[in-house]
């Protein structure tokens, strides 16, 4: 306990900055993932063939070791935050893409026909009918992706990306448990807090009727 208190006294200010770095690289990667995966998911629902293949390819990328992905970008982008964000972006895509595809495919076809009947264009159907109804499922994918990235972002320090992983790597290299705890505990707290916030957002986006069905089931 004495070592942990000493760690906080010595590194309190830097700990806040490392936490900010960790949140920043994770958040940027998730936002990029949303900007790519949601439109791609919409496009895949319009494809009669090939959607499963594309999702399968993204799934393969997801199974690659995190350190291998990070190392792959070093010759291309060097070291620092940029390659870390790009690598995390690739990991963020699958849950969002899969849930967008599943959510939109699950929209009641009668509602789409009603939209056509009142003169909605395909773009208006996506914007006003499909995305709002699929929003809870999409948000669940964003939530999953974000929690994954909070954990994976600790590896960003491997290529100089910063974040709370710096403390974990220092602790492992120098065998200083207080540094490991100083990095691991804030990451865990971040994951719990962000998961709670996104769970609330997911509930807010779920229509009242669907919420009642979930409660009854």
Swiss-Prot record:
It is a multi-pass membrane protein. Residues 19-198 form the ABC transmembrane type-1 domain. Changing residue 216 to V: In strain: ATCC 6633 / PCI 219. The chain crosses the membrane at residues 23-43, 52-74, 84-101, 128-148, 150-170, 180-200. Its main location: membrane. One of its GO terms (biological process) is amino acid transport. Keywords: Amino-acid transport, Cell membrane, Membrane, Transmembrane, Transmembrane helix, Transport. Signal peptide: none annotated. Induction: Repressed by GbsR. InterPro entries: ABC_transp_perm/SBD, MetI-like, MetI-like_sf. It is found in: Cell membrane. It holds the Pfam family BPD_transp_1. GO terms for cellular component: plasma membrane. Involved in a high affinity multicomponent binding-protein-dependent transport system for choline; probably responsible for the translocation of the substrate across the membrane. PANTHER family: CHOLINE TRANSPORT SYSTEM PERMEASE PROTEIN OPUBB, GLYCINE BETAINE/L-PROLINE TRANSPORT SYSTEM PERMEASE PROTEIN PROW. Belongs to the binding-protein-dependent transport system permease family. CysTW subfamily. This is Choline transport system permease protein OpuBB. It comes from Bacillus subtilis (strain 168). The gene is opuBB.
């Amino acid at each position: 306990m004495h070592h942990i208190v000493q760690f906080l006294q010595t590194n309190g200010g830097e700990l806040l900055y490392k936490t900010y770095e960790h949140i920043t690289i994770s958040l940027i990667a998730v936002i990029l993932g949303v900007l790519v995966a949601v439109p791609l998911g919409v496009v895949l629902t319009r494809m009669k063939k090939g959607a499963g293949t594309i999702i399968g390819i993204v799934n393969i990328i997801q199974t690659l070791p995190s350190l291998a992905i990070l190392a792959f970008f070093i010759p291309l982008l060097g070291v620092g935050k940029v390659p870390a964000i790009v690598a995390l972006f690739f990991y963020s895509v699958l849950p969002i893409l899969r849930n967008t595809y599943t959510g939109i495919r699950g929209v009641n076809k009668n509602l789409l026909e009603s939209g056509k009947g009142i003169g909605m264009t395909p773009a208006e159907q996506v914007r006003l009918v499909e995305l709002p109804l699929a929003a809870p499922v999409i948000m669940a994918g964003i939530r999953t992706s974000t929690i994954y990235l909070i954990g994976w972002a600790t590896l960003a320090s491997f290529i100089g990306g910063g974040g709370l992983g710096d403390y974990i790597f220092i602790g492992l290299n120098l065998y200083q448990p207080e540094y490991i705890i100083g990095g691991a505990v804030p990451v865990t707290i971040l994951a719990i807090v962000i998961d709670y916030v996104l769970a609330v957002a997911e509930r807010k986006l779920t229509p009242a009727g669907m919420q009642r069905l979930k409660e009854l089931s």
